[in-house]
Structure formats: C-alpha cells, structure tokens
Amino acid sequence: MGLSHSGEIVYIHPSSPVDLFTTCASLPTKPPPSFSDMPSPLFLVSGFLGVCVAYAVANIIRQLLFPNAKEPPVVFHWFPWLGSALTYGKDPYKFLFAARAKYGDVFTFVLLGRNVTVHLGVAGNDFVFNGKETHMNAEEIYGPLCNPVFGEGVVYDCPNSKLMEQKKFVKFGLTTDALKAHVRLIEHEVVNYIKSSRDFKGPSGVINVPPVMAQITIFTAAIALQGPEVRSKLTNEFASLYHDLDGGFSPINFVLPHAPFPHNIKRDRAQLKMRKIYEAIIAERRAGKIPPTTDMISHLMQCSYKNGRPIPDSEISNMMITILMAGQHNSSNIASWIMLHLANEPQLCEELYQEQLDQLADEHGNLPELELHTVEKLKLHSSVVKETLRMHNAIHSIMRLVKQPLPVPNTSWTVPPGHAVLASPGVSANSNEYFLNPTKWDPHRWDDRVIEEDDESEMVDYGYGRTSRGTKSAYLPFGGGRHRCIGEKFAYLNLEVITAVMVRNFRFKNVDGRVDVPGTDYSTMFSRPLEPAEICWERR
C-alpha cells in the first residue's frame, strides 16, 4: 500500500516485482532550500541587536523602577553582564571617586556578570579586611588567577589555616638579624648594577625608568630572600621564565584561567620549569653540596607544619615562586615612581643626599656602606617611600567573596552571598578628609605624622604571630587583617636602600623640561607608570 502522485491510496501486491526504492524515487521531492531562502546576515545581526536592546531596556527599567531597598544602590549601567567594566577598568580610582560622590561610601557595581559591593573609607577598609573567614574569603576570588602562577599546595590552593602557617614560616624568616644582612646585599646589588648596566654608561644619560627598576628590584629580592644560587640563575633564561609566568596575571584569567591562550600555555610551562630549578637547589642543599646559608630557602627547609609534616620540596619551591612574584610588582612600581618624582622635583633629591651627608658621612665627607641602624636614621628617605606608597599603591582594589548574608554596619543594607566586596585603601589614602592636598606628592607631610596603628587591644593572631589588625587607618599600602602582607618590613627596607644608593650616585631631572610625572597604566593587574617613562640622570 502507498500513495499515488494524486494522493490516492495504491495497493501493491506483495508478490509484485515492484522496486520500492524506484517507486519512492519516482515520488516528487521538495527541493532543498536555496541560499536565498535562508535568513540574511543583516536579519541575523538585526535580531541579535534587537535582543541586546531588549536586555538593555529591561536592565534600565529594573534599575530605575525596581531598586532593591535592602541592598546598596547599584551604579547605573546600560548592559547587564558588562556593567561598569569599561569605565572601572580604564581608571579604577576615577570610577570609584565618581561613584562615591553620587552614591556614598557603599554601593554596588556590575563587573563582567559579578555584583561587586564597594565599601570605601576607613570603615570600608575595616569591613573588608577584618571580615570573618566564614563570612567572606579571598580564595574563591583570587584562586583562579593565582593558583596556576604560584603552584599547588600554597597560598590560595590550600585551606586558609595552612596558608596562615605558611605566612608564619615566611614571617619568622624575616628576622631582624636577616634584615641586617639584607642591607649590605641590597646595596651591593644596586652598586653592581650601576657599574655594569649599559643604561648608566658615561657621565650622564636618559633611562626608561620602569624596566630599569624592574631589573634592580628582582636582583635585590633574589639575593636577599632567595639565596645566591637563585641570584646566579637570573640570566636571560630565568628572566624569560619570569616574564612568561608573570603573563599569567592577565585580567582575563579571573574569568578564563585555564583557557588555552598562548599566555596560559607559556605560564604553565614556566611554572613547571621554575619549580624544577628551585627543587634542584633544595636537593643540592640537602645533599650538603652547598655551604649552609641563612636565607629563606634554608629557613623553610627546617620548618614543619603543626601536624609534624615537613614542608615538601615542591611546596618550598612554590612558596619561593610566590615570594618572588608577589612582592616584585609593588617594589618595582614604587621604586619607579620614586625615581620619577625625584626627577620631577630635583630639590628633593638634593635634600635626600644632604640627609645622608648630615647623618652618615665621616669628618671627610665620605659616605660609608649602609647598615640597618644607619638606614633607620634616614627619616626623609623613609618619608619618600611612605608618600610614594600613599599615592601609587600598585593594587587599587582588594576583593573578597561573600559566603553568607553580610549586614553593612550603620546601614539598613545587607550584602547577599555571591557578591564580591571591595575595599580600596588607595581611595582613603588620596582623600581630602584624611590627607591635606592629597594629589600632591609631599614627603614632608610625614615629618610630624606617624602611621596610625591600632592599640594593643586591637592586636590579634591569625595564625602567623601577633599583629595589629591594621585596618582602622587611611594608610594601608600593605593591606590589613589576616591577609596583610608579611613582607612589609623588607619592602620598606629594600626601597629605602635602593633610593639611598641611587641618590648617592646621581642627580635626576625630567626629560625635555617635562612637568609632572607620567600617568598611570591600569591595563594590567598591577598599576604602573605609563611608558615610556624617561628621566635624565647625571653622575655626582
């Protein structure tokens, strides 16, 4: 039985030698759709744009007509997923100050699909930095970005209690005796760089400051914290590995940390190779092939966790990578800003030189090698570092992920789980309410001012030794709370010694009569001077 062309039923005898395939083939077939019958590209684009417009309109209506009174106000934005990403990413401080002027210290903005609740000012610093671990955490925010760079078993790739133990190990490796030894090492490293670098050949010249200071700070950190073997390996190959590993801090990796982008492939290869380098150094030390030293690697080799388990060599290696990577950006960028400001204000450079003559020179006017107790006499040098950290902290935003409903003190608002909370110590450090004329670089503002620290009643032990909560201050260049930077003392010392050595050897001024310092580049994870950032130097 079948259908005729006219649609009538046709009976076919079972024994009839009819080829069913031939019969079916003889039936009319519908021709395939031609290209002209398909939707045009213009139609598809128009449809896509229509959907986007509909989403944008719905998003605008929701913001204007149906705000959630139980949550902080939301910064107006056109598109629901993109939110304020473009304006925030272009200049975070400009965005935060503008939003603060309109909404107050507490507000929410949308950043690539995530709601970010901002709390500014001293109260905001305390709110975010002193949040309980059960209420908010850093691991889920920074883990995707940092874990592939730092490696397994350290920092955000482990429970917070283990991280606190690791911070304790590193902190107690930065003893006063260790800092005393670091001064000479740092000074010699800077002097040797000046003698050997092509950038400082002759009586005068011009340098692009950021790459020069990046090299100097990685050399000083390596010799002081990492040991002579690591310093000796800072060749072109190691520098290339560092560069590839540093590429893992690309902002896109907050969202796509394991995507097969070229920079991620290079990151993973560099992490493995760098870890193998450290493991080889540790193996040689355990075999007694290298004389005992007092650096961080030797210290960590003798440490054990609370459960009695010695730190595995792989974790020591990853901790050393973390120390190298985590501190390098801030030190390099701050050292660059110091040089740029001294070139912009040459009289301040001369004040620094005169301070060394007044405090350290012998009866013949000769300056001795630096030591920890002599560096501590250089108050203006210390003020230069503090003031530069105040104005140019490399990390403009610090976030945590909210895990349970979080009431905002002194408001009727609650931050829901899934939001990120954001503190920006740089906003309070550059606000008129805390610092007079905050946009002016003025080291002398610290002549009679001390860094506000909490009193003894505010001391707390997060698991790595008693420390100030350090959050009720407008000046927090190294963060606060349980995640406060433990390398703070070394960072200050490193920057002060580098500054002292550079001032001893050179005078600085701007190129071609340029006024002021370059702008800030916010295109990477760590803000830095826009390049080229050139200055003139002249030997004393």
UniProtKB/Swiss-Prot annotation:
Subcellular location, record wording: Membrane
UniProt xrefs under CDD domains: CYP51-like
UniProt GO MF annotations: heme binding; iron ion binding; monooxygenase activity; oxidoreductase activity, acting on paired donors, with incorporation or reduction of molecular oxygen
Xref: InterPro entries: CYP450_sterol_14alpha_dmase, Cyt_P450, Cyt_P450_CS, Cyt_P450_E_grp-IV, Cyt_P450_sf
Chain ranges passing through the membrane: 41-61
EC number: 1.14.14.154
Cellular component terms per the entry's GO annotation: membrane
Membrane topology classification: Single-pass membrane protein
Cofactor: heme
A Pfam entry, by short name: p450
Pathway: Steroid biosynthesis; sterol biosynthesis
Cited SUPFAM superfamilies: Cytochrome P450 (SSF48264)
One GO term (biological process): sterol biosynthetic process
Alphabetical UniProt keywords: Heme, Iron, Lipid biosynthesis, Lipid metabolism, Membrane, Metal-binding, Monooxygenase, Oxidoreductase, Steroid biosynthesis, Steroid metabolism, Sterol biosynthesis, Sterol metabolism, Transmembrane, Transmembrane helix
Record field: catalytic activity: a 14alpha-methyl steroid + 3 reduced [NADPH--hemoprotein reductase] + 3 O2 = a Delta(14) steroid + formate + 3 oxidized [NADPH--hemoprotein reductase] + 4 H2O + 4 H(+); a 14alpha-methyl steroid + reduced [NADPH--hemoprotein reductase] + O2 = a 14alpha-hydroxymethyl steroid + oxidized [NADPH--hemoprotein reductase] + H2O + H(+); a 14alpha-hydroxymethyl steroid + reduced [NADPH--hemoprotein reductase] + O2 = a 14alpha-formyl steroid + oxidized [NADPH--hemoprotein reductase] + 2 H2O + H(+); a 14alpha-formyl steroid + reduced [NADPH--hemoprotein reductase] + O2 = a Delta(14) steroid + formate + oxidized [NADPH--hemoprotein reductase] + H2O + 2 H(+)
Binding site for heme: 485
Gene3D superfamilies linked to this entry: Cytochrome P450 (1.10.630.10)
Function: Sterol 14-alpha demethylase; part of the gene cluster that mediates the biosynthesis of tetrahydropyranyl antifungal agent lanomycin that acts as an inhibitor of CYP51 and blocks the ergosterol biosynthesis. Sterol 14-alpha-demethylase plays a critical role in the biosynthesis of ergosterol, the major sterol component in fungal membranes that participates in a variety of functions. Acts as a self-resistant CYP51 that contains mutations found in CYP51s isolated from azole resistance strains and that is not inhibited by the final product of the cluster, lanomycin.
Family: Belongs to the cytochrome P450 family.
Protein name: Sterol 14-alpha demethylase
